Amino acid sequence: MKITVLYKFSGAGNDFVVIDGREGDVSAFREVSRIEVLCEDYKTDGLMILGSGNTEVDFTMEFYNPDGSGGMMCGNGGRCIVAFADYLGIKPASGGVFLFMARDGLHTGEILERPGGSTGSPTDRWIVRIKMIDVQGISPMLGGYFLNTGTRHFVKFVDDVEQVDVDAEGKALRWDPAFAPIGTNVNFVHVAPDGLHVRTFEKGVEGETLACGTGLTACALVAHHAGVPTATPGAYRLRARQDWLSVNFTPGADEKFTDVYLTGPARLVEIH
């Protein structure tokens, strides 16, 4: 019987249990009760399964929230699974750039830096850039903005992000009737001289997480929509709770954003 190895990855503080599902039966890891237990035991924000590639993609990505819900994209999860593919020795078929399929469609992933030190050292990380889906439509509502960057996000600008009660206010907005029936993730953003400082309440986790890749992407696009200045057009630096990330994009007509990229660190934390 093949023993499934569990890997814990962290993408800028967003932690995941990751499984190599290319060989053996991993169907048990899709069960809600199993996902809940693993995410609780390993203190992660989700579980991912890397699946086999085919003639079109190098691998597939399945993402599940700690409550077992799936069907959405996770940006930091996408960066971590690209690092995981590199760790496993998977070679991209297309010019050094990985192609992978997630629930929201096709993505690319590129390794910009590889670990150069031991686990826990300042250089033990990958720097990964992934291409997100094109985004069209930003809807002003409830004192903020709503959009979909692979999953649903509400973005609200605040004067001091450190003073926000993210769990209380985030929960109220997450379940607001305007977002019924499935709700939304909620991001609070402070525009600072060094970039956008972001805190996120994630549905499925039902609390604040240390980072959210699709949320950071949403915040950058909303910042552009709202006219927030940036040193480089179509590029924003964003501070999650533990790390800096960047979002680059090409704005177009009718609030359509293409060539949307999320870049940041990914680390292999432990193996079980």
Q: For each of these PLM feature ranges, what is it?
A:
Residues 1-124, 155-272:
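A glycine-rich beta-to-alpha transition motif near the start of alpha/beta enzyme domains, typified by
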Residues 130-143, 168-171:
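Active-site glycine-rich loop that binds ribose-phosphate moieties when present
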Residues 138, 142-163:
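Internal active-site segments that recognize and position negatively charged phosphoryl groups
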